[in-house]
């Protein structure tokens, strides 16, 4: 069977459901597909199809995630839902499923719970730009004062973790009523999708961001000079443009004198392309794997940062024992390993396998970084953790 061509007529946004266990994330995901299927915007997907989420591997970590897609009048969405709490933690820290926005599901009958808090905090740490709240199970609450109280609690919690709690849309409804085909259930889902459409901002496309390419390999071509290869992470590089080589050593300026892909010469390379870039006047020994090529001034090298990290459990192939302050593993950024020292917060004695933790790191060499950069922690060549830079300290 021929694959249907993906028609890109509407802007695309990645979102996901987050929230406490049993508050109705998967039911809501199913309800969205079933309601939108009525107008041809989705393929109706039942609860148990979503709940049986396939396992995926991302940077050596196994994560269960369910993906559904649907369309509203304005946008095309890819929506991710995870079955277990640990899957959410891993998913958000590894960025396995990038989220441009989230739907926070809170049960009106229970109010915010520990994982509600943790998911809001993680969303903030990993840079989820915006979220909309679905106050679920309102059919189980008879007292309007109680609903108001829960809404207030949710808004306070969002504000506490740095989201604009007062302006975030909160939609009240029941995913179950929507699944049962009740009109009030359906109305709430449509309201929710309108809020997601209007409140979650359109993400900046990778091609519109400043040019950045992690260097994978360096070659010397006699008579032409030095060529570096890699996959363009963001932006566009045109022949003749000035670029900087950042990380590991002092930043150097150079000029792109050629872009090559599949042995053909191009005028430009753009995000997603695997290219070779010819550098004017740069010697082969002045550039190495692990550095990046970047638009001048767009990124700086740093060696001190704070991170949110998921530490693999023993079952996942991680460490068998906890680690303590001054632990010195390898940090794998983009294309290279750099040794670094971990400093735990004063109230934390150790980090257990299977935990997620916040701590600071000092690398022995600076790496081109900005907040939101993902990395792996490795020990003797195997992955023992995955993290994201939440704050740069120097």
Swiss-Prot record:
GO terms for cellular component: cytoplasm. Its main location: cytoplasm. Residues 60-64 are annotated as: G2. GTP binds at residues 19-26, 81-85, 136-139. Keywords: Cytoplasm, Elongation factor, GTP-binding, Hydrolase, Magnesium, Metal-binding, Nucleotide-binding, Protein biosynthesis. Mg(2+) binds at residue 26. CDD domains: EF_Tu, EFTU_II, EFTU_III. InterPro entries: EF-Tu_GTP-bd, EF-Tu_GTPase, EFTu-like_2, EFTU_2, G_TR_CS, P-loop_NTPase, Small_GTP-bd, T_Tr_GTP-bd_dom. Residues 81-84 are annotated as: G3. Residues 136-139 are annotated as: G4. Its EC number is 3.6.5.3. It is an enzyme of class 3 (hydrolase). PANTHER family: ELONGATION FACTOR TU, MITOCHONDRIAL (PTHR43721:SF22), ELONGATION FACTOR TU-RELATED (PTHR43721). GTP hydrolase that promotes the GTP-dependent binding of aminoacyl-tRNA to the A-site of ribosomes during protein biosynthesis. Belongs to the TRAFAC class translation factor GTPase superfamily. Classic translation factor GTPase family. EF-Tu/EF-1A subfamily. This is Elongation factor Tu.
């Amino acid at each position: 069977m021929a694959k249907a061509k993906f028609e890109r007529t509407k802007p695309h946004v990645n979102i996901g459901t987050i929230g406490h266990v049993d508050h109705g994330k998967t039911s809501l995901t199913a309800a969205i597909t079933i309601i939108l299927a009525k107008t041809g915007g989705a393929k109706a997907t039942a609860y148990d199809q979503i709940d049986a989420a396939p396992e995926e591997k991302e940077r050596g970590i196994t994560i269960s995630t369910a993906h559904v897609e649907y369309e509203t009048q304005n946008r095309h969405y890819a929506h991710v839902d995870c079955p277990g709490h640990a899957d959410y933690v891993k998913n958000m820290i590894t960025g396995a499923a990038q989220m441009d926005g989230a739907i926070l599901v809170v049960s009106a009958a229970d109010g915010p719970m520990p994982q509600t808090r943790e998911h809001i905090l993680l969303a903030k740490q990993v840079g989820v730009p915006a979220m909309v709240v679905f106050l679920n199970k309102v059919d189980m609450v008879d007292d309007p004062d109680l609903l108001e109280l829960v809404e207030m609690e949710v808004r306070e919690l969002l504000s506490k973790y740095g989201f604009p709690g007062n302006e975030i849309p909160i939609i009240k409804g029941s995913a179950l009523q929507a699944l049962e085909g009740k009109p009030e259930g359906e109305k709430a889902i449509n309201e929710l999708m309108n809020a997601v459409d209007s409140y979650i901002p359109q993400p900046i496309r990778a091609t519109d961001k400043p040019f950045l390419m992690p260097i994978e390999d360096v070659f010397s071509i006699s008579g032409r000079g030095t060529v570096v290869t890699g996959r363009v992470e963001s932006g566009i590089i045109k022949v003749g443009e000035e670029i900087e080589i950042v990380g590991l050593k002092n930043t150097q300026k150079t000029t792109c004198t050629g872009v090559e892909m599949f042995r053909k010469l191009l005028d430009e390379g753009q995000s997603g392309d695997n290219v070779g870039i010819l550098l004017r006047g740069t010697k082969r020994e002045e550039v190495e794997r692990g550095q990046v090529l970047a638009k001048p001034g767009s990124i700086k090298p740093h060696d001190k940062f704070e991170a949110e990290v998921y530490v693999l459990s023993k079952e996942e192939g991680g460490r068998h024992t906890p680690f303590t302050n001054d632990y010195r593993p390898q940090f794998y950024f983009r294309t290279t390993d750099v040794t670094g020292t971990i400093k735990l917060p004063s109230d934390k004695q150790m980090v257990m396998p299977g935990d997620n933790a916040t701590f600071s790191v000092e690398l022995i060499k600076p790496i081109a970084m900005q907040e939101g950069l993902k990395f792996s922690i490795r020990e003797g060549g195997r992955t023992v953790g995955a993290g994201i830079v939440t704050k740069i300290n120097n």
